[in-house]
Amino acid sequence: MATSLDFKTYVDQACRAAEEFVNIYYETMDKRRRALTRLYLDKATLIWNGNAVSGLDALNNFFDTLPSSEFQVNMLDCQPVHEQATQSQTTVLVVTSGTVKFDGNKQHFFNQNFLLTAQSTPNNTVWKIASDCFRFQDWSSS
């Protein structure tokens, strides 16, 4: 069992990675969308308002259909996922919420969560999206 200091260090590292990831993700979504799939694992799944999209080609096609966007993240939360649940794969749960305006549409509140996994490369470790769930969170007018 890790000491509480080790766990705190682990959580701090996860939070730094999540903050960096969120900045990169939403900037890429708004300004360089064609590069967005570089942030996903080859077999990643996106659930967009209940509609599933899996694999890089399908993700690319899906992102191409979206109008240009302006995301504003108002909340970020993250936590490491216990290694027993991920077969010792370093994984972080990232939850965001905020507002988004797609060109030609009204502004919406959104909630998005990501499961990020650490992928080792010869020079460093990069975080890739294994799972992404996006949902509009607009208030009911009833």
Swiss-Prot record:
Subcellular location field: Nucleus; Cytoplasm
Domain named NTF2: residues: 17-136
Record has Transport as a keyword: yes
Coiled-coil region(s): none
Chief location bin: nucleus
Biological process according to GO: mRNA export from nucleus; poly(A)+ mRNA export from nucleus; protein transport
Keyword Disulfide bond among record annotations: no
Domain of life from the UniProt record: Eukaryota
Keywords linked to the UniProt accession: Cytoplasm, mRNA transport, Nucleus, Protein transport, Transport
InterPro entries assigned to the protein according to its UniProt record, in alphabetical order: NTF2, NTF2-like_dom_sf, NTF2_dom, Nuclear_transport_factor_2_euk
One Gene Ontology CC term in the entry: nucleoplasm
PANTHER family registered for this protein in UniProt: NUCLEAR TRANSPORT FACTOR 2
Function, in words: Regulator of protein export for NES-containing proteins. Also plays a role in mRNA nuclear export.
UniProt subunit comment: Associates with NXF1, NXF2, NXF3 and NXF5.
Official protein name in the record: NTF2-related export protein 2
Protein's organism: Homo sapiens
